[in-house]
Amino acid sequence: MSGVLPGPAVTLIVGTMLFVLVAAYQRLRPKPLQGIPYNQGAASKLLGDIPEMMGYVLRTKRIFCWLTSLTTRHQSPIVQAFIKPGALPWVVLTDPFESQDILLRRTREFDRSGFFGELIGGILPEQHIQFLSADERFKNPRNLINHLMAPTFITKVSAPEVYKSTCTLTKVWEAKCAQAQGQPFSAHHDITYAALDSIFASSFGLSESQSITSQRLEAVLHMDPEMTDHQVEFPEGTVPEVFAAVLTLTNSVTDTQLSPAPVLTSWVLRQLPHIKKAIAIKDKYIRDQVNQSVRLIEDGKIEPWNALHSVLLREKDVAAKDGRQPDYYKRSIFDEFFGFMMAGHDTTATALAWGVKYLTDNPVSQTRLRDALRTGLPQAATEKRLPTYQELIKTHIPYLDAVVEEVLRHANPIAFVVRQALQDTTVLGHQVPRGTNVFLMANGPGYLETNMTLEDEARSPGARQGQSKGLTGVWDNNDISAFRPERWLRKIPGTGDETFDPMAGPTLAFGLGPRGCFGKRLALQTLKIQFALMIWLFELLEIPEKFNSYDGVQRFAREPTQCYLRLKAVN
């Protein structure tokens, strides 16, 4: 019998392996933070909440709505989820006022999370928004591009290009309106390509012949539409390869967002031939544009021609102050502009696509906006023409501001903001250790769903409504889920006139504080121009239910699966 018993060496090896496995399990298994609700079943599994989350992703092609659903499930404004084995849980927060305090005041305790870098770092390794505020990789590029969001630059350079591209888009829709004869057509690509046109034009300059929307207009004017299944299908036209490359790379972020291992997913994607090709096309295009701007600088042109030319002029000035040669071709400049193209076109196009749907389904709001525009721009109305760019930017129309904000509140192009704890701290009275990712959700209770009952004392001092200034109002539970732009208006005492109130209630469409969305000013100006021209020219008619789903899909931003128009020209 003794011959079949394991020897000491085998026993030691087996024992060591068991010890290592047990130690690894203990190291990797979920470790809940005390007092914060969580899924009990997930806490006992090595993969935590990953199986449930991925099941939701496979069904819906969305991820962040699942995070918000946990707060409803546990009836708590703060929950935790176990997404990365061996790592700290994700903390999910839906209380608007605690979120505002974190973003606006507690900037020494919370900063940009590395989570965003995991999503975009593979294709944008030096884009500034993924780095901590104290990091030179954040500060130096930001100093180069800050002036692009100055009101003067937007007014003189960027917004005129938005106006031009939107006018071309309305010509496409005028042609489609005439040919469709009251039947619906998909507007999604029209909106996406017009957004790309305006971003490319303001960033690099874009001639009429290079405009994809102009090409689509020619295609519509010279081809007969095809009627299928009670909708009209129009020709798409040819998509320039650099536009296609931007869309390919933007859509690749979808896969990283929906993956529990985004860094690995991004690496795998970058090995694929079509992604490699898209990266090469994008890099060559930006390099060619840099070459063109450098020639302008060498020829002595110092008046900014476009955003890239302006940034390179700034690089020249900074280099002179630093006593070095300007580096016009550094990777950070390339990444800043590609990030600008990718995020800028996708978020504004998505917001407009959702806005088309909400205004179509809320004809009272649509009519009120049209009346407000014609009242605010009486000369254009009298002369029966489009408002000029100068007329639009010089005229303040409170209801237009309100419509834009209400669309953003409902659309939730970016449904969350994520911050990382820089030190051991508290959130809603719960201990949160250093390194924890805190997801501040903008699509749940307090934003679009009934406010959760929470004693003010449970919040951090800066988040208490009775003690802290600078907090927004609270949305009325009776209509919090309704599309109602009027919620953003208040009457001026004494005159009774209405004014737009950006603090009427909570929203996180652009984040808040020093690390809020860099492109917020341009995005708001863009949406105001687009909605103004669209509603000035067209009545958005009711869409058949089969073409009017409100399902969304997570790409770079959350976009609607269907965006159809039935248009009637407004005299």
Can you describe what each PLM-predicted range is?
Residues 114-118, 157-352:
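Cytochrome P450 heme-thiolate monooxygenase catalytic core
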Residues 347-360, 530:
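Short, small-residue alpha-helix embedded
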Residues 235-238, 361-413, 433-436, 459-461, ...:
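Cytochrome P450 I-helix active-site segment
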Residues 443-497:
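Conserved cytochrome P450 K-helix/beta-meander segment immediately N-terminal to the heme-binding cysteine loop
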Residues 56-72, 386-428, 449:
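Conserved cytochrome P450 K-helix E-x-x-R motif and the immediately C-terminal K′/meander segment
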Residues 363-366, 503-506, 512, 520-558:
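Cytochrome P450 heme-binding "Cys pocket" and the immediately downstream C-terminal segment
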Residues 3-127, 136-140, 163-168, 434, ...:
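N-terminal membrane-proximal hinge/A-helix region immediately C-terminal to the signal-anchor transmembrane segment
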